[in-house]
Amino acid sequence: MWKQKTGISVSNSYGVPVPELVRLVGRTGFDAVSPEWEENDDFAETAEAARESGLAIQSLHGPFDIAAKMWSADKDDSGEALRKLLLSLETCKQYSIPVMVVHVWMGFDNIPAPNSEGFENFGKLVKKAEEYGVKIAFENTEGDELLFALMEHFDGNGNVGFCWDSGHEMCYNHSMDLLARFGDRLIMTHLNDNLGISRFDGKTYWTDDLHLLPFDGIADWDYNVARMKKAKKQEYINFELNIRSKPNRHENDAYGEMPIERYLTEAYNRACRIAYKMAQTDNGCF
C-alpha cells in the first residue's frame, strides 16, 4: 500500500503447500512474506515462488518448539536446540533473508530464572548471525522475564532486535506496553488480534493465542498504531495470522471455511486499514 508496505507470515498451517500459498499472497497484494522454517522442507521452492511473485522475504521464523531447551543445563538438549536454530540461520544466509525470528521460551510452567547456559547458547546463535549478516529478532511470548534478560544481555548489539507480537502482548504479557520498552529496537512485527486472557485469575495459556484478523478481537488498533509510530520505523508491517481454531474454541472457524483466496483478500483488507493509519500524520494527512 502507498507509503507503508505490508507482509504476511506463511506456513503449512494454511493447508496448501507453502510455495503455492506464496503465489496466492503475491496475487492478493502483499509486498512480503515471512516463512516458517521446517527442517525437511525444500526452501528453494518457497524462495523461487517469492521471487516470481515479486515478494520480499522479510524474515524467517526459526523453530520454536525447542526454545525452552536453550536454557537447559543438559548439553544434549541444548545442543539439539542450538543445532536447529543454526540450521535455520544457514537458510537465512543462503537466501539473503535479513531477519530470523526466535522465541526465547515455550511453556507456561517451570519457567527458569535466566541462567548462564541460556546466555551462552543464545550468544553462540547471535555470534553466528553476526558472521552471516543476519539480525536476530527475539519475540515476546510466554516467559517474558527471559525476553527481558536477553534483550538486556544483548543491549547495544546491532544484530539483536525485537519482534513485537501484538496478540501475545495481550494474551501472554498482560497487555504490558512492550513497544515502550523495546520500540527503539523493533525490527519485525507479528500483528494479530485475540480476546485477551480468558481466565479471571490472569493465568495465561496457549489457547488464548488466537491470531485473529485485526479488528476481529478486542485490540485497540488506534492505540497500537500510535505506539508503532513512536517505535523504529518498519519498511514492512507483517501480520501473523491463523485460520485454525484452538482446541475447544471456535473463533477461527469461519476463516477455515473460506476459500483461501477469499481469506487472504480479507487479511489484505485488514492490513491496508492498519497501513493507512500508519501512513497518516497526526492531522490526518499523508
Question: What name fits each language-model region?
Answer:
Residues 13, 238-259:
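A short, acidic, flexible beta-alpha connecting loop/helix-capping segment that sits on the rim
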Residues 1-87, 93, 258-286:
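N-terminal pre-domain/capping segments
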Residues 4-10, 33-35, 57-62, 100-102, ...:
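Hydrophobic faces of well-ordered beta-strands that scaffold small-molecule active sites
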Residues 52, 71-162, 251, 262:
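Active-site acidic/histidine proton-transfer and metal-coordination neighborhood
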Residues 123-218:
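Acidic/histidine-rich catalytic cores of soluble enzymes
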Residues 12-18, 32-45, 69, 107-113, ...:
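Acidic-and-aromatic substrate-binding clefts and catalytic sites of carbohydrate-active enzymes
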Residues 1-2, 22-27, 41-61, 87-96, ...:
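Acidic (Asp/Glu)-rich catalytic clusters
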Residues 25, 33, 50, 92, ...:
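Conserved, mostly hydrophobic/aromatic
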